[in-house]
Amino acid sequence: MIRTDVYWQKINDLKTALKDAGYSLDIDNQREELLRLEKELEKEEVYTNLEKSTEYSRKAQAIRNKLEVFDKAEKAISDAEEIITLAE
């Protein structure tokens, strides 16, 4: 039988570290900012202004990239939890 307690501890440590990283990266506000930027990009005065639309698009993509990495880390931890549960 596999000693899952060691793995659960590692998972909990990773979850804590990811939560701390989420606070440091201000993930919740980043998600809100992305929504705001996407709404702005839909406005005619923005998408008809090349400079503004380029700036907003760049900012939105940078946020998407951060969120993608963060979300992948969350998913990896969740997958590891499922694997450990199956091993028990």
What are these regions (language model features)?
Residues 1-88:
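Charged, heptad-repeat coiled-coil alpha-helices that serve as long linker/dimerization "arms"
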